[in-house]
Amino acid sequence: MKVKVLHLFDAWLPHTMNWAYRILDATPEVQVQVAAPWMMDNGYLREDYHFYIPKWQQWMGKLPKNEWQMLAFRRILLKFEQIYPIYIRQLEKQIQTQKPDLLHAHFGPVGCRYLPLAQKTGIPLVVSFYGYDYEKAPLLKPALRARYGELFEQAAAITAAGPKGKAVLMAQGCPESKIFISPMSMRPEEFPQHKRFKEPGQLNLVQVATITGKKGFMDTLQAFQMALSRCPNITLTLAGERHDTALVAEMRQFIRQHQLESKVQWLDFLPHTQLADFLHNFEVFIQPSHYTADRDCEGGPVSILEAQSGGMPVICTRHFDMPTEVLHEKTGLLAEERDIAGLAACIERFYWMDNAVYQEFSQNAGAHVRNNFDIRQTGIRLKNLYNNILKIEF
């Protein structure tokens, strides 16, 4: 018999969170239910999943097609829901007809909001941490620190993407015995190994990510500009949703100031279905992520796994759990956070690298992802966690 798991989100589902859909899809022998006070009809409303669509959206008769439609209203609604949890009260009544065996909240603050529901119904709660919720959320909202303490005490299990995430949660008081490592993962066959030929003295770099501070876009541009004088046959392509408008303006100014227009191509949001083919045009993926002033961070970016799966080495930083995804001197090169000179040196090294050495990096990258980040294995481990909580025999 399948385990019934109710997955809890703020919104189902922004395109940039397609990885969450893939986690649910890869977990075997689970009857998936999804609850969120904001639902979107953007390709993730599977017929075999049960969705608790908010009543007000049912009254409207249609759902927004993406995260950009009705954005201002969505933000107001979610803030209102945090103060007056009307949707959660409705959900408590609705789940009585298909009562789940487990609740699985995605992101720490979501877990805090649904903890009273778990306590009232007696349904075990699993909470997954991914990024901003590790340190940024409790820094900006100090009241969350106490709520995290209660969450760590009452939840059946807490998941983190890697050892750094585990250490951060333990430092905040989460018992080690409750923490389960569930790495960010992907399907390697969706990004099959692609043969590239690398000549010394040429390099095409690419960075694909939502344009926010923690992704390190300005560090990429500065390192690229620093390396350019020694690496004239180099190009950089940037792609991603332009979320942080102030950062976008700063990037534009930097490109103009240093006359990089002929060397830097800047694209908009790229659908995930096009990403694998798009990456064939480049030799190295770069993402120098770092902490922001408000302690926003990456858990473990899926994009650098996808790039490596396709045989592309990665330049990144020793930020959070990224060193478990990219192995220094084996599948890519790592620099310290905000080390522009170090990043430039990594770029220059790949620029002058010959094909034989490049192929070693390429083969290692693909094998590393296939062996350690196949989402089907992650799904099996997650299902085993559910079984352990419910004391189900394997």
Residue ranges and their predicted role:
Residues 280-295, 312:
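Acidic donor-binding loop of glycosyltransferase active sites
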Residues 328-329, 333-340, 349-355:
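Conserved acidic donor-binding segment of nucleotide-sugar-dependent glycosyltransferases
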Residues 130, 145-193:
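Donor nucleotide-sugar binding/catalytic pocket of nucleotide-sugar-dependent glycosyltransferases
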Residues 235-250:
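Glycosyltransferase donor-sugar binding loop
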Residues 18-22, 203, 210-226, 246-249, ...:
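A conserved mid-protein helix/loop that constitutes part of the nucleotide-sugar donor-binding site
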Residues 248-273:
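Nucleotide-activated donor-binding/catalytic signature segment of Leloir-type glycosyltransferases, i.e.
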Residues 6, 159, 190, 196-215, ...:
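Conserved donor-binding/catalytic core segment of Leloir-type glycosyltransferases
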Residues 304-309, 313-316, 326:
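Short hydrophobic beta-strand element within catalytic cores of glycosyltransferases
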